[in-house]
């Protein structure tokens, strides 16, 4: 039987970043689920690049705004909005706010 040992940890989802690229911070990885905080300051997916992940993804915008593009159109996300992206749903980030920075909470999982 596999056991996971967790220790009490504290963090702040709104800790400022000073980077020139998106910042990805893994908060939890356990079995079939992982949670990340992503901070984007005006960053977008490279031209022609599409995510095609083998995991489902729940993503919520905690601060700022963003726009995702799928093969079926664009989805605007403002602070408090979330979207559930099925595995292998091709998508890309076409906009993120820079002031304030876009802070995402992403939960990934496998069936």
Regions found by a protein language model. Give the residues of each.
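A short, N-terminal "cap"/entry segment at the start of jelly-roll beta-barrel domains
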Residues: 1-50
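Short histidine-centered beta-strand/loop micro-motifs
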Residues: 25-27, 46-53, 70, 75, ...
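A structure-centric signal for secondary-structure junctions around beta-strands
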Residues: 32, 55, 101-102
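Short, conserved beta-strand element in jelly-roll/cupin
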Residues: 52-67
